[in-house]
């Protein structure tokens, strides 16, 4: 299965964000949602949907998202993405390419990825920022169907995230898990946790002092959480990263949604 999702935004004469170009092939669908009380006023809320029960060997998901200048998009997904069992040497792939226009804002939080027994999955995400643009991007992955006794029973998981501005990298984050060759339950790895989440925030309009204050606020929020291991780090330039280890996907999802609202409220783009 080769599936494509292409989505772009435009700004109406009333200053509201709408879908512009929109193309999907099965099993993808996109549904726009009613406006709700949000710090990003006049933004577009949408849900990325899929009718697939999961990814199989040789499946390729190709996602392209482009935001026009001065537009704002909050994009969520409908359900977990499951990578099904496959023969040794096979794998499924997802490629995501995102481009943010000047003064645009994107909050993209897909549901968790679940790695079934004997599965292999490779994903790359490349995001190009523009002047004064703002990004909140999250990823959550589960090491298997833990309630079925699957812990690190998958074969391979590889994830590469690159965020750049004017062809200059702001952050590059790579995860490579090979359970048969790596001690992934050791100290400083996953230990006894079953879910990992990463949330990256980049706002090129913020200076280092402002970002440091936001890091302190999120560290205080993290200190209130239970049954999670949370770290908040300031990037070298214009942003921060939150990394979480937990025993359930939903608590990471809810935490990231809460952090997203905190970060949106501090946006300096109206």
Swiss-Prot record:
InterPro entries: UreD. It comes from the Bacteria. The keyword Transcription does not apply. It is found in: Cytoplasm. The keyword Chaperone applies. GO terms for molecular function: nickel cation binding. Belongs to the UreD family. UreD, UreF and UreG form a complex that acts as a GTP-hydrolysis-dependent molecular chaperone, activating the urease apoprotein by helping to assemble the nickel containing metallocenter of UreC. The UreE protein probably delivers the nickel. This is Urease accessory protein UreD. It comes from Actinobacillus pleuropneumoniae serotype 7 (strain AP76). The gene is ureD.
